[in-house]
Amino acid sequence: MFVKSETLELKEEEEVLMLLGSASPASATLTPMSSSADEEEDEELRRPGSARGQRGAEAEQGVQGSPASGAGGCRPGRLLGLMHECKRRPSRSRAVSRGAKTAETVQRIKKTRRLKANNRERNRMHNLNAALDALREVLPTFPEDAKLTKIETLRFAHNYIWALTETLRLADHCAGAGGLQGALFTEAVLLSPGAALGASGDSPSPPSSWSCTNSPASSSNSTSPYSCTLSPASPGSDVDYWQPPPPEKHRYAPHLPLARDCI
């Protein structure tokens, strides 16, 4: 029984391979290679007196009697394979086209983002330049046609704002002082010694270089927030001028601060 089933299987495989070889030349490569065992079996099947030969002939007649059934059974499988291949090819082409479209989309998005970033940076620089130009218009510059850089403009604006703040605080301090000493001190801070000497004419000495500072960097050991210093090159007579006068000299003078001292 084992020999019969093996022979039938071999014959069926040969018939299937023959049908496939006639259908497509590519299937000819799938034919099995002959061996010595196969040749011996073929010889036994061809002998007319042997039992295996009779059984092989019957099996061969049965297979030849229904060639359409074997071909019909093999053709649907091959057709299915061709259909799968046809389906795979469009899917591959679609994948390639999708990849190309995706790369183009990514490049387009990157270009759009870069253009938007450039526009934002350009607008920011325009706004910054416009703001600095408006700041230069309100800052006092000497000469007026001097062109300041951005850093110089910001530093000068900082110093100018600080000077205005100190001037306002000095005016408040002058308004709060009711004595003649506060008025004279304010006059010493706001007026130059040369202008005061030219107006009074009490001393013929030349004007000295006074410097009154009220900055955060002033020394901490001073009792007053306002510190006035005299340069070494100035004469000593100017120190006597800035000292407050004796009380009997201004006995009948009203002790009121001058209007120019509070400006």
Swiss-Prot record:
Enumerate the spans annotated as bHLH domain. Answer: 112-164
Which portions of the chain have biased composition (kind: Low complexity)?
A: 197-231
Q: Does the keyword Nucleus apply?
A: yes
Write the record's keywords in alphabetical order, separated by commas.
Activator, Developmental protein, Differentiation, DNA-binding, Neurogenesis, Nucleus, Transcription, Transcription regulation
Instruction: Name a GO molecular-function annotation.
Output: protein dimerization activity
For bias type Polar residues, the affected ranges are 24-36
- Compartments, record wording: Nucleus
One Pfam match, given by its short name, reads: HLH
Q: Name one GO biological process term.
A: cell fate commitment
Transcription: is it a keyword of this entry?
A: yes
Q: Name one GO cellular component term.
A: nucleus
CDD domains per record: bHLH_TS_NGN2_ATOH4
Q: Where is this region: Disordered?
A: 20-76, 197-253
Q: Which SMART domains match?
A: HLH
Subunit arrangement? Efficient DNA binding requires dimerization with another bHLH protein.
Query: What is the annotated role of this protein in its UniProt record?
Result: Transcriptional regulator. Involved in neuronal differentiation. Activates transcription by binding to the E box (5'-CANNTG-3').
| Name of this protein | Neurogenin-2
User: Taxonomy-wise, where does this protein's organism fall, top ranks first?
Assistant: Eukaryota, Metazoa, Chordata, Craniata, Vertebrata
